[in-house]
């Protein structure tokens, strides 16, 4: 999901 990608990138 988009949230996982966002926090995973950080």
UniProtKB/Swiss-Prot annotation:
Modified residues (Arginine amide): 10
GO cellular component term, pick one: extracellular region
Keywords: Amidation, Neuropeptide, Secreted
UniProt GO BP: neuropeptide signaling pathway
Top-rank taxon, per record: Eukaryota
Tissue distribution: Expressed in the abdominal ventral nerve cord (at protein level).
Main location: secreted
Localization terms from the record: Secreted
Protein's name according to its UniProt entry: Tachykinin-related peptide 4
Organism: Oncopeltus fasciatus
């Amino acid at each position: 999901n988009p949230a996982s990608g966002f926090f995973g990138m950080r």
